[in-house]
Swiss-Prot record:
Residues 220-238 have a biased composition (Basic residues). Residues 216-244 are annotated as: Disordered. This is Small ribosomal subunit protein uS3. It comes from the Bacteria. InterPro entries: KH_dom, KH_dom-like_a/b, KH_dom_type_2, KH_sf_prok-type, Ribosomal_S3_C_sf, Ribosomal_uS3_bac-typ, Ribosomal_uS3_C, Ribosomal_uS3_CS. Residues 39-107 form the KH type-2 domain. Belongs to the universal ribosomal protein uS3 family. Part of the 30S ribosomal subunit. Forms a tight complex with proteins S10 and S14. PROSITE patterns: KH_TYPE_2, RIBOSOMAL_S3. One of its GO terms (cellular component) is cytosolic small ribosomal subunit. GO terms for biological process: translation. Transmembrane segments: none annotated. It holds the Pfam family Ribosomal_S3_C.
Length: 244
């Protein structure tokens, strides 16, 4: 049987960039790798409800630049920047190095596989039926402009004695096409029957050479829709003013 490889790892260096961008000697490589893992774990733990999708880490001499991609930047930053300052102090204490933290907002949450997976997991923890949780979330992503989505939930579904996996898919998911921009997310739900694993594959279109993720048709259509709404609102405002 053919096993499924992580779609992000398969596309690194082709259409995706690394989440950790630094170079190290043999003696330092292991330490840096463990440090990156600890940084990500601490950020996830401290800002669990902020909807963090990914954390990018860059290193230069004795400085670390951390970029947090989140759906709720206000929760990470806190009032007058108190939250991000507290997080920075904790990370500096953990690493013993100077840190720069950037917080970037994810504008389209339904088009981020990690956030979609975490959304399904949170619904499962609230005892919502796994079929309903998957189908509703998939419909939202397809309405948001995704070209295809596949979800899978594994574990003791519905409290059954034997663990099993159940999944649904909609649209197209070309996993073997390396230029296909497929986002992958994984989350765990802690239920009274044990842990349930949630996997999400989300297809956003083909990424051709020289393109960035923002150039994908999914995001371009979203921007065009926003501009259309703005123009329509301006026209309505002008026509009402003319009538008055």
């Amino acid at each position: 049987m053919g096993q499924k490889v992580n779609p992000k790892g398969l596309r690194v260096g082709v259409i995706k960039d690394w989440d950790s961008r630094w170079f190290a000697d043999k003696k330092d490589f292991g330490d840096y790798l463990v440090e990156d893992h600890k940084i990500r774990e601490l950020i996830k733990k401290e800002s669990f409800s902020a909807g963090i999708s990914s954390v990018s880490i860059e290193r230069a001499s004795n400085k670390i630049k951390v970029t947090i991609n989140t759906a709720k930047p206000g929760m990470v930053i806190g009032r007058q920047g108190a939250g991000v300052e507290e997080l920075k102090n904790k990370l500096e204490k953990l690493t013993g190095k100077k840190l720069i933290i950037n917080v970037e907002e994810i504008k389209f949450q339904d088009l981020d596989a990690q956030l979609v997976a975490e959304n399904i997991a949170s619904q499962l923890e609230r005892r919502i039926s796994f079929r309903r949780a998957m189908k509703q979330t998939m419909q939202r992503s397809m309405r948001a402009g995704a070209l295809g989505i596949k979800t899978m939930v594994s574990g003791r579904l519905g409290g059954a004695d034997m663990a099993r996996s159940e999944g649904y898919s909609e649209g197209t998911i070309p996993l073997q096409t390396l230029r296909a921009a497929i986002d992958y997310g994984f989350a765990e739900a802690d239920t009274t029957y044990g842990k349930l694993g949630v996997k999400v594959w989300l297809y956003k279109g083909e990424m051709l050479p020289g393109m960035t993720e923002e150039d994908l048709p999914v995001y371009k259509n979203k921007k065009n829709d926003k501009n259309k709404k703005r123009r329509n609102n301006n026209r309505k405002g002008k026509s009402q003013a003319a009538k008055n």
